[in-house]
């Protein structure tokens, strides 16, 4: 009976570690996607080290979980006490680090608010300057999502280098409607747009558009993080039980 329980525990631990392996692969994939993202969203928040570093933390955690899941599977199948103990200590450290990161993310969640992005836009944006990384990235986002600023064209009234100009002269070209949403796309009516004709401007703010586009993925990432933490907790319990059961 004891042998059957040990065998069952061994395969359960293998299963949990296989899920850790998959979770690590997912985090690794998301981290790589954020870093190499062709639309350059990372440049928008590059001024905030906490947000910019988050992708690299996710990448590192994904790589460690990927390796850890593989080692856990090997330790369970081979019934190696040394490998199981190493696995338990390592996954405990990762579990505590991830829990700390989740708490910090909750505490600093205001850094992703509408007000934060509006402040950063007004502080760093230079109109129609594609040699300026921050501005070029914002232009790409506005063209791709057919939106303007964080809240709308009025955001550009307070852009420092242009604050002395009327609203219609402060609206960037990137806010003008195009027949095709790309930099190569022809303007519907560029002149009327820059003169302030709202019919040819993208009036909706990018914050709402992007939030609606990525809302599903945000919830998915949160669910994935909770799932990974739960699996790690169960894996630690099974690892210690298996460690004590091996003669």
Curated annotation (Swiss-Prot):
Stated membrane topology is: Multi-pass membrane protein
Cytoplasmic compartment: which residues? 1-15, 71-82, 244-247
PROSITE patterns xrefs: ALBUMIN_1, TM4_1
Q: List the disulfide bonds.
A: none
Listed transmembrane segments: 16-36, 50-70, 83-103, 223-243
* Protein's cellular compartments: Membrane
A Pfam family recorded for this sequence: Tetraspanin
- Cross-referenced InterPro entries: Tetraspanin/Peripherin, Tetraspanin_animals, Tetraspanin_CS, Tetraspanin_EC2_sf
Keywords assigned: Glycoprotein, Membrane, Transmembrane, Transmembrane helix
Single Gene Ontology BP term? negative regulation of neural crest formation
Q: Which is one Gene Ontology cellular component term of this protein? A: membrane
What family does the entry list? Answer: Belongs to the tetraspanin (TM4SF) family.
Job of this protein = Maintains CDH6 protein and promotes CDH6-dependent adherens junctions, inhibiting neural crest migration.
Protein's recorded name = Tetraspanin-18
Q: Which species does this protein come from?
A: Gallus gallus (Chicken)
**Record gene name:** TSPAN18
